[in-house]
């Protein structure tokens, strides 16, 4: 177990594609060589989708992750409460199972029984309850870590796209683009690239908010009044930040290849080009937290649920990315811990 990590896996909405992409991922034999998975789910849900997919996976039934066995698919069984899978349908009961899985896995993570957590897609509506009043996983884990800020970071190979704002309506984006907020996101981003990706002196590109990055104030003044002065101040703090760049040309001309990270101003500005470039294989990483949480870069996929056609590449990559980030953090921690300190006489 020493060379592997223990990864908690939440089932997500059982009427979506979450169970399918989890099961399909284990057809990749590398996973059990490097990762010890612990799935939180009623067994009946997995059996339903296994039959649909004609898979014959076996599970180790355990009470808690401390009993997890290496090179096995470990399962912590949750009560199903007479739940029946209705693939493609949004139901209250499916939301309850998604929350139970998330809550139990998060609890075990907080007890250091898990090394990382990989979350399957949820429906942000039917999961809502007294204990889950969030716009998504990102906000949930941020509050559970007793933090006010985190960074939604999309990752695929060397492409990394962070978001200055997360799940905001368009009309709320501009008022949220403040220098104080940008500094918080940029500092998180810079630390993440160093600690979680082992990049020294990372270079970060900022996208403009308006078309053509504002055209010197002709199409909005956020760049001229906020973003450009912010970049100048960030450089004074020895942060390697550049821009603002017009988003369309930046991605179309592959300028992202010149940087270690890109900071988009709002959700779709970053995720649309990211998903096109990553070809459905990207990973969502919640950066800036003490824990490691990743997920696939897509939603519940109700329209294809239960049909056996869901692409599991993004979920599989989320498992491997969580493992890699965990080991990179450990490497940095060990280097810092074992740093040679010279006294004044030396």
What are these regions (language model features)?
Residues 1-137, 180-265, 269-275, 280-283, ...:
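Contiguous, glycine/small-aliphatic-enriched amphipathic segments in soluble metabolic enzymes
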Residues 137-140, 146:
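Acidic, PIN/NYN-like endoribonuclease modules and their adjacent C-terminal/linker elements
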Residues 144-159, 289-303:
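Short, flexible loop segments at boundaries between secondary-structure elements
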Residues 154-184:
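Ligand-binding beta-strand-loop-alpha-helix segment within the catalytic cores
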């Amino acid at each position: 177990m020493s060379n592997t990590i223990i990864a908690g896996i939440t089932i997500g909405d059982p009427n979506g594609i979450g169970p399918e992409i989890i099961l399909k991922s284990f057809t990749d034999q590398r996973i059990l060589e490097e990762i010890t998975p612990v799935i939180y789910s009623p067994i009946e849900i997995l059996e339903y989708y296994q039959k649909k997919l004609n898979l014959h996976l076996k599970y180790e039934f355990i009470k808690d992750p401390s009993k997890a066995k290496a090179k096995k698919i470990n399962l912590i069984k949750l009560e199903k409460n007479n739940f029946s899978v209705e693939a493609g349908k949004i139901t209250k009961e499916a939301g309850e199972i998604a929350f139970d899985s998330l809550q139990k896995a998060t609890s075990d993570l907080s007890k250091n029984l898990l090394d990382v957590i990989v979350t399957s897609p949820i429906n942000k509506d039917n999961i809502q309850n007294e204990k889950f009043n969030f716009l998504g996983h990102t906000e949930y884990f941020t509050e559970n870590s007793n933090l006010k800020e985190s960074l939604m970071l999309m990752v695929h190979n060397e492409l990394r796209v962070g978001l200055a704002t997360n799940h905001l309506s368009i009309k709320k984006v501009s008022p949220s683009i403040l220098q104080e907020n940008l500094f918080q996101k940029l500092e998180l981003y810079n630390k993440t690239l160093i600690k979680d990706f082992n990049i020294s002196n990372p270079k970060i590109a900022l996208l403009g908010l308006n078309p053509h990055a504002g055209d010197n104030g002709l199409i909005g003044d956020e760049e001229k009044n906020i973003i450009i002065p912010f970049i100048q101040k960030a450089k004074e703090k020895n942060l390697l930040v550049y821009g603002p760049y017009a988003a369309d040309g930046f991605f179309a001309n592959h300028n992202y290849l010149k940087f270690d990270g890109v900071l988009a101003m709002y959700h779709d500005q970053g995720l649309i080009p990211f998903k096109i470039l990553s070809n459905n294989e990207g990973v969502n990483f919640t950066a800036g937290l003490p824990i490691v949480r990743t997920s696939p870069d897509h939603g519940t996929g109700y329209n294809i649920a239960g049909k056996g056609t869901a692409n599991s590449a993004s979920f599989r990559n989320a498992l491997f990315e969580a493992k890699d980030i965990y080991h990179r953090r450990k490497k940095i921690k060990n280097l810092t811990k074992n740093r040679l300190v010279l006294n004044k006489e030396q």
